[in-house]
């Protein structure tokens, strides 16, 4: 359905922050500060016990032995968290399969296509190297259910009875399972509908998980592959590279004369593209390009694309012009996927580059998104710049404001009064949105307006009010 107006959901409706430890994308924090090896061990203990209890209820597994796949990104701390999780899981009787350095979507793929009870990805996605996170994936390859997260948090806070240890031969086993990652690479290659021969493609792997996978895929499909930022050292993940520092890829594409470029984040669940001229093609534009193509080929289920409230107003105008319906959800690919599952929609995503193709995946997948963009370019025999030019993007400025307390900062009457003032100023020509980050002590202030200068001015007005009332760190 097409939602009226350009403000989408109300601010209260869009804020979905889970609990004390788990945010919109798992348990994330600075390593050894607010995410510790003790936390990881206890998460492992709980998951091994929880899925073991579920397994006991099945006729073919009376011993309650569950199977858990673990992947990690390239941060130095990922290894210590992996060891802690393995210790907790096996102490509770779970068998653990190590995928090693791999992407979040690969863990999801392995779990949902094999007999795993759950999967864990150790990553803080686009965050700096000193942060890390624990993402838990259920047996269907989806983000973990919120009721289970509540129980994990209760255990972390000591509100549950102590979990018994597995003894003797009930102690879990640990297995090297790099073969699972390799099977995922083969799956990605099988999705491509055409050879990429003759195409010069640049990949920015963010010195992260994509470094282990992306080049293999594009080389196998015949592309002339140029890879940058694929030498991780544990400390350089996302540092001046990848999807959050897209200018690096823009310059490289222009200098090297590539036909297209793709930038990933630390765990490669998102993708931002760069066209042949070095212009950015973000998640909104990718949704339009793929959505229009899927409508033309009769593969856009329900004739609907699922977006979030952060998507640009220009995207909705383009969808309206093409007769494509859309849904708006809270920010987070978790909520995009929930909508897709509930209503049977097959394409959804975020401006940040989390794109979900439900025919192939249950979570955002940066490398898969690259393949789908290549498919449209090849099938339509068009450059990416030409495909993206059909959308007139409204200027948008978003600033992340680090604050002492997210809720207090956003709900402050003075801040809300300033938001109302900006809303009145913009009228029907734009919008303002305040949103609390689900993973950081940050309030995001976003304005869309006729000019970038006006966006900057209005965003800064709101931030100044936050500063004046003592909210900003």
Regions found by a protein language model. Name each.
Residues 11-87, 91-92, 174-200, 407-411:
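An N-terminal, well-structured beta->alpha segment
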Residues 30, 132-256:
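Gly/Ser/Thr-enriched, mixed-charge loops and adjacent short helices
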Residues 57, 67-131, 216-274:
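N-terminal small/polar loop signature for handling phosphorylated ligands or for N-terminal nucleophile
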Residues 71-72, 203-205, 275, 359, ...:
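Short glycine-centered, acidic/aromatic-flanked micro-motifs in structured strand/loop junctions
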Residues 150-185, 190, 276-349, 356-357:
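Proline/glycine-rich low-complexity loops and linkers
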Residues 260, 297-473:
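Phosphate-binding and adjacent anionic-ligand microenvironments
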């Amino acid at each position: 359905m097409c939602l009226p107006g350009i403000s989408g959901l109300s601010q209260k409706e869009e804020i979905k922050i889970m609990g004390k430890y788990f945010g919109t994308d798992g348990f994330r924090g600075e390593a050894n500060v607010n995410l510790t090896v003790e936390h990881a061990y206890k998460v492992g203990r709980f998951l091994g016990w929880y899925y073991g209890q579920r397994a006991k209820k099945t006729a073919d597994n009376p011993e309650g032995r569950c199977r858990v796949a673990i992947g990690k990104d390239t941060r130095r701390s990922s290894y210590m968290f992996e060891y802690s999780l393995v210790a907790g899981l096996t102490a509770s009787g779970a068998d653990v399969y190590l995928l090693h350095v791999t992407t979040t979507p690969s863990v999801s793929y392995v779990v949902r296509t094999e007999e795993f009870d759950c999967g864990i990805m150790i990553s803080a996605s686009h965050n700096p190297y000193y942060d890390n996170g624990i993402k838990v994936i259920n047996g269907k390859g989806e983000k973990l259910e919120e009721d289970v997260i509540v129980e994990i948090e209760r255990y972390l806070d000591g509100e549950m009875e102590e979990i018994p240890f597995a003894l003797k031969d009930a102690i879990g086993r640990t297995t090297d399972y790099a073969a699972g990652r390799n099977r995922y690479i083969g799956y990605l290659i099988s999705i491509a509908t055409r050879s990429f021969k003759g195409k010069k493609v640049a990949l920015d792997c963010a010195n992260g998980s994509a470094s282990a996978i992306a080049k293999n895929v594009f080389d196998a499909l015949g592309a002339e592959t140029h890879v940058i930022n694929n030498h991780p050292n544990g400390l350089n993940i996302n540092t001046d590279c990848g999807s959050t520092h897209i200018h690096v890829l823009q310059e490289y594409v222009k200098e090297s004369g590539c036909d297209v470029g793709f930038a990933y984040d630390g765990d490669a669940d998102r993708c931002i593209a760069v066209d042949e001229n070095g212009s950015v093609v973000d998640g909104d534009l990718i949704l339009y390009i793929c959505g229009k193509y899927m409508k033309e080929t009769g593969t856009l289920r329900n004739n609907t694309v699922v977006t979030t409230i952060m998507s640009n107003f220009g995207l909705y105008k383009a969808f309206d012009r093409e007769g494509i319906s859309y849904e708006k959800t809270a920010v987070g690919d978790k909520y995009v996927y929930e909508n897709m599952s509930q209503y049977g929609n097959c394409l959804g995503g975020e401006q940040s580059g989390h794109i979900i193709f439900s025919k192939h995946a249950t979570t955002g997948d940066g490398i898969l998104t690259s393949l789908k963009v290549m498919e449209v370019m090849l099938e339509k025999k068009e450059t990416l710049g030409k495909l993206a030019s059909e959308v007139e993007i409204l200027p948008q400025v978003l600033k992340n404001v680090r604050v002492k307390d997210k809720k207090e900062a956003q709900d402050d009457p003075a801040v809300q009064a300033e938001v109302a003032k900006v809303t009145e100023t913009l009228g029907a020509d734009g919008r303002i949105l305040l949103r609390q980050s689900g993973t950081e002590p940050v309030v995001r202030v976003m304005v869309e307006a006729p000019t970038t200068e006006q966006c900057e001015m209005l965003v800064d007005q709101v931030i100044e009010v936050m500063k004046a009332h003592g909210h900003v760190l």
